[in-house]
Structures are given as C-alpha cells and as structure tokens.
Amino acid sequence: TGDWRFEENPVDGKKFDLERLTEIAAKEGITLLMNESTNCESAGTHTHGEPDIQKSIGQVMEQYQHNRLIISCFSSQIHRIQGILTEAKRAGRKVAFAGYSMIQNLEVALRAGAITIPKDVIVKMEDLIKYPDGKFTLVCTGSQGEFNAVLNRMASGAHRHVKIKNTDVVVFSSNAIPGNEKYVVRTVDGLMREGSRVIQNGKTHLTGVGPLHLSGHGYYDDHVKLITALNPTYYMPIHGE
C-alpha cells in the first residue's frame, strides 16, 4: 500500500473502497500484504475528518479577520489546499502560494482535475502589498522546519517578499514528523522572535479553534480492520514501526 486512512466524508467524495478489496481477497486470496504502518501504534481510529479541518481553518480566518494569515501544510495535501481556498473565498481573502513543491503539486492537481479554484481568489505572492492584511492569505511549504523552505526563510528574516510583522498569524496545518521536532521548534521560535503569533495543531485550545491537521495514516483499529478484511497469508509492515 501507499499512505492510507479511512475517511467517512472525503472532500472529493471518493471513499476507501474496502468492500471491493474484500471481494478481491475472497476471490483470489492475498498471499502477502505489505502495508504502510506509520501510525499503527496510535490507539483507536480517526475521530475527525478533512471537513473538520476546513471548518477550523474557517474559524481562524474569522477570528483573525484583520490579520495577514500564513498557513503552512504538506504540499501533497490537495484536499487541505482545497479547503483553504474554499474558506478564503468565503472570507473574502486572496490566496498566494509559495514553495516549489507547493506550486508544482497545485499545477498537477489542476491538470488532473483534482482541485477546483474559486474565481478571483489566487494572486501572485509579490502582489501581497496590494491588499489589506485581513484580505490576504499565504499558503506555503516549511511545516517540517526544512532549512531552505519558505517558512524557515521567513522565520530568519531572509525571505525576499514576506517580512514577518507582529500582526501576522502563522498557522501550522500539520504535525511534526518524528525526528523533525527540533527543526519545527526552531522555525516556530524564529517566527515568534520576528513578532508573529503562531497557531499549531495540538495546541489549538489556546486559541479556541478546532483541529488543524489530520494524519494521512491509519491508526491501530484501522489496521486491524484492513488486515481482518484482507486476511493475507503473510503480513509485512513497511514505512513505519
């Protein structure tokens, strides 16, 4: 498998077709299941879905309606980007994208018809000075504290277009991948030293908004459900513990 999770209300309406996989397993049999197991040690199953994340992002836009928002997420999370665009349209905000992988993935998603761009929402990053702070949102790479990513350059004051100011609100719509914690903390520290407010998933109780990230990997109960349905002769966990 690749990365997977069970989603009751996916943004694109395409659910994990476990019924079809079960049919194949019953008819042909599964000799070996090589399953990505990144979150297999996390108890239970997901208690919220991507629509909940979108709702939380909308809450942030409403709560900080006079502030410039900078949202960092994984560039491969097309559904997350779709949610940000939808909420930005609702809030009357313009959206710019920054980061090579972010722009590349967005272009591929557009060509594949995997994302819908609301009319008159996307602008160029260099045009941010044309809009009031409360009407501008930047979506960028760097949620893992990568040294050369857009967000880290902002945190160090080295970005040529965006200089962090004390009215900015930076949102991490992500979790730190194990091993990246110190890099994320370094970026957060830099952003706060530059003067911005930082909102991180898992710490949203400090701001009153809901969850800002949903893992793309199944939890323990999800793995049990998949293995039980496919009933392979052999099982090999990969890409995890």
What is the meaning of each model-derived region?
Residues T1-K130, A149-K163, K182-V184:
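His/Asp/Glu-rich metal-coordinating catalytic cores
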Residues L85-T86, R90, A109-E241:
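C-terminal regulatory/interaction regions
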